[in-house]
Regions:
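Sec-dependent signal peptide recognition
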Residues: 2-8
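C-terminal motif of bacterial Sec signal peptides marking the signal peptidase cleavage site
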Residues: 13-16
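A short, N-terminal "cap"/entry segment at the start of jelly-roll beta-barrel domains
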Residues: 20-66, 106, 149-154
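Short acidic-glycine-tyrosine-enriched beta hairpin
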Residues: 60-62, 101-119
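Conserved short histidine dyad/triad with adjacent acidic residue
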Residues: 63-83, 115-119
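Glycine- and acidic-residue-biased ligand/ion/polar-headgroup-sensing regions
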Residues: 73-76, 83-102
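Short beta-strand His + acidic residue motifs that chelate non-heme Fe in jelly-roll/DSBH
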Residues: 78-80, 98-99, 121-127
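Ligand-binding loop in jelly-roll beta-barrel domains
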Residues: 118-142
Length: 154
């Protein structure tokens, strides 16, 4: 994987999300750059989805807004589910798919941007052939709510 591509994707998404309605970075944040190679990232397994890993870059996905790098094994399929907060993804490697159902799911390769509104029921996963790595930004805590839990009336 090209480090330049990963860095470019992070810069583009960060710039796109630097809107006036967001507070400016504190002096400490803006004066201390974060520079880390992909091999230096510290990975944690996602408790809700065995095999998936994440490396937090900023914030805390357990409690609120965050940015992180996600790693998903090739051939992973996520059943119909939702997340309570909006999530933005920039695909770095692999082919990620998502859609309202399996029939309407679209494939997204490196460089693709996928923005999912909070509470949107969808399927997702990583196609066979290559693990998926993507930059992810959430405007609230990360959660994975299977369709039955997300909508008890179903």
């Amino acid at each position: 994987m090209s480090r330049i591509f990963l860095i470019t994707a992070v810069i583009i998404l960060s710039a796109a999300c630097n809107r006036p309605d967001k507070p400016a970075a504190t002096a400490n944040e803006s004066s201390t750059p974060m520079m880390v190679s992909f091999t230096e990232l510290k990975w944690t397994e996602l408790p809700e989805r065995k095999g998936m890993q994440f490396s937090v870059l900023s914030g805390d996905p357990k409690t609120g807004a965050y940015t992180q790098i996600r790693k998903v094994p090739a051939g992973t399929d996520n059943p119909l589910h939702s997340h309570s907060s909006e999530i933005k993804n920039v695909i770095v490697t692999g082919v990620w798919y998502t859609g309202a159902d399996v029939a309407s799911a679209k494939d997204f390769g490196p460089g693709s941007i996928v923005v999912m509104p909070g509470n949107w029921l969808h399927v997702s996963g990583c196609r066979s052939g290559s693990d998926c790595v993507f930059y992810q930004e959430g405007n609230g805590k990360f959660d994975f709510m299977p369709a039955a839990a997300a909508n008890p009336a179903q």
